[in-house]
Design a protein with these regions (language model features):
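Nucleotide-activated chemistry modules centered on ATP-dependent adenylation/adenylyltransferase
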Residues: 1-263
């Protein structure tokens, strides 16, 4: 929570990048505690690709209303319609990469100088180099050689006009830490994280939710499976796992026993 308070103290226009996944939900929960009894003093920024799970969008809207926090939505479809990016086609088509342009536009339009995210170092190799305060230049680029020291939990948020920071309060948390915290605090999550029945296709060894956004390959047959999601993103790229974990306690035990990362 001290990282969130440090952001509020050092930056003029901070925002929380909210994906609707468990990590951004935990960040938002921590922000609510950090600034209580006041409201969260920064908006939630969500980049809507148009290919999100409906459950994610419903949860996002309900959470913003319950907390009384401003919700800013950047639309990938608007970016496509404006001719600033081109829609991908084919069986591997995804809007995952396209959302980068929408995010940068949203940051620029909102003049946000600090964007708080839920990324963790244990998720993938690229994120292992991230600091708590991660500097971005005026083109939105990250240079690992141009990061500030963070000795003794001292953070340097100084930046030139047009530059900004990504801030990662959960940088040193693990997936198990996240679930232990969610279980302890009894934090509400989208139903997608719990075991449920869903029509799926298995593609290249990955279980994907069957949807109108997922072009079906020849020979693929959707089948009903009992699955849950460890991480949430677009319908077209978010892989599921077969599971019967339908409570927080079962999910936490499942995560503790797994030897495969969520990404």
């Amino acid at each position: 929570m001290f990282v969130l308070r440090e952001v509020a103290a050092q930056f003029e226009r901070p925002a929380i990048l909210f994906s609707g996944g468990k990590d951004s939900i935990v960040v938002t929960h921590l922000a609510a505690k950090a600034f209580a009894p006041a409201r969260i003093p920064m908006p939630l920024v969500h980049i809507d690709t148009g290919h999100n799970f409906p459950e994610t969008i419903e949860f996002r809207d309900a959470l913003a209303e319950r907390l009384g926090v401003q919700l800013i939505v950047g639309s990938v479809q608007d970016t496509i319609d404006g001719g600033r990016v081109r829609e991908e086609t084919g069986a591997q088509a995804s809007r995952n990469r396209l959302q980068i342009a929408t995010l940068l536009e949203t940051i620029e339009n909102g003049k946000y100088d600090a964007c708080i995210g839920g990324a963790r170092r244990d998720e993938e190799k690229a994120r292992a180099k991230e600091r708590f305060f991660s500097h971005r230049d005026d083109f939105g680029q990250w240079d690992p050689k141009n990061q500030r020291p963070e000795l003794w939990n001292l953070f340097n948020g100084k930046h030139m006009p047009g530059e900004n920071f990504r801030v990662f309060p959960l940088n040193n948390w693990t997936e198990l830490d996240i679930w232990n915290y969610i279980t302890r605090e009894q934090i509400a999550l989208p139903s997608l994280y719990y075991a449920h029945q869903r029509m799926c296709v298995v593609r290249d060894g990955v279980i994907l939710a069957h949807s109108e956004y997922l072009p079906q390959r020849e020979g693929e047959t959707p089948e009903m499976m009992q699955i849950r999601f460890r991480t949430l993103g677009d319908l077209t790229i978010t892989g599921a796992i077969e599971s019967d974990a339908n409570t927080l306690e079962k999910i936490t035990a499942e995560v503790a026993a797994t030897r495969v990362t969520e990404r």
